[in-house]
């Protein structure tokens, strides 16, 4: 590195003090936000390189600026590793985020005003799957599909019937808060039945797909998008995969020049590192442990009747819990748990009755604690603390004791 930490602190103490404070917070908190993780030092090192200095509009071998021969090597490494990891023929590693990756797919495959089907936000979908406040809902005619009200699982027969009724040009599968395995083969059958494209947003489960613990959407989807953080444990960014050469050309044009200018090559370098890490056999064990830890926490909540785990459990890295029999709403639960240094987010549940600013539920995820080396025993203990804190949210002495117990645990599992 060009400067060391002391150089930074001397130049900008206000900023570095904030960074130090965040480092302390991450070390001393149990992180259960399902979309967050702990990246490796190698990922951070790559993202902090002088690659940030270089403009490289275009793609490897087809740049608009000179001096990009080395940049081409970096980006090609990321592309080839993504293709190998997910078994895809084409990969675009330039999207700055998952949202921009999704926007590029929409721009490539459909026109403004076209009908699209996506998962309802309260059922577990994502803002970019048609939420009215998102560009997706404002630009396209999104029709939401839901989960079954009783089982809280995807009902593929109902989705097929709905697709036959609305005749979408595109069907979006994937979720940000759905705890069960998604049957991508079924979704492809539905898409084929109505002549629609199928796009899968696997942002949340990409790491589990990579580790072999969730079926891959790549053989079934016309296009697959993902983020490179979350369970994939890389830098914040996006990635697009396809096996169709014609679609790949459209996607490349949609990303650049359609949506973005120069790619963030320092971030792409960090993506390459994360993809290499995911190709390592050790990553399979990580994916297995992520699922075991989530299941262990869900099992604890299932043993306490005042908490209701949505759909009864989990097969991936997250689950939702209805907390309204214990506290007023999910926002209150989030705040109570933050008092004991357990961080998660309030979350809508299927057929939500409260506003998204309050919600009936919380979302619990295991990727970050698993990256710190915590296992099923620690996961169960964390869930027990959560239950105890929420049931005793009006007892400061209980919260103080739990906060101390959390500190002992986080000290035993250093962030780095």
Curated annotation (Swiss-Prot):
Site (Plays an important role in substrate specificity): 229
SUPFAM superfamilies found in the cross-reference section: PLP-dependent transferases
GO cellular component: cytosol
Binding site for (6S)-5,6,7,8-tetrahydrofolate: 121, 125-127, 355-357
Catalytic activity: (6R)-5,10-methylene-5,6,7,8-tetrahydrofolate + glycine + H2O = (6S)-5,6,7,8-tetrahydrofolate + L-serine
A GO MF label: glycine hydroxymethyltransferase activity
EC number: 2.1.2.1
Subcellular location: Cytoplasm
Class of the enzyme per the UniProt entry, highest EC level: transferase
N6-(pyridoxal phosphate)lysine: residues bearing it: 230
Cofactor(s) required, per the database record: pyridoxal 5'-phosphate
CDD domains referenced in this protein's UniProt entry, alphabetically: SHMT (cd00378)
One GO term (biological process): tetrahydrofolate interconversion
Pathway: One-carbon metabolism; tetrahydrofolate interconversion; Amino-acid biosynthesis; glycine biosynthesis; glycine from L-serine: step 1/1
Cell membrane keyword on record: no
A UniProt-annotated Pfam family: SHMT
Alphabetized UniProt keyword annotations: Amino-acid biosynthesis, Cytoplasm, One-carbon metabolism, Pyridoxal phosphate, Transferase
Family: Belongs to the SHMT family.
Subunit structure, as described in the record: Homodimer.
Function statement: Catalyzes the reversible interconversion of serine and glycine with tetrahydrofolate (THF) serving as the one-carbon carrier. This reaction serves as the major source of one-carbon groups required for the biosynthesis of purines, thymidylate, methionine, and other important biomolecules. Also exhibits THF-independent aldolase activity toward beta-hydroxyamino acids, producing glycine and aldehydes, via a retro-aldol mechanism.
Protein name (record): Serine hydroxymethyltransferase
Organism of this sequence: Streptococcus thermophilus (strain CNRZ 1066)
Phylogenetic placement of the source organism: Bacteria, Bacillati, Bacillota, Bacilli, Lactobacillales
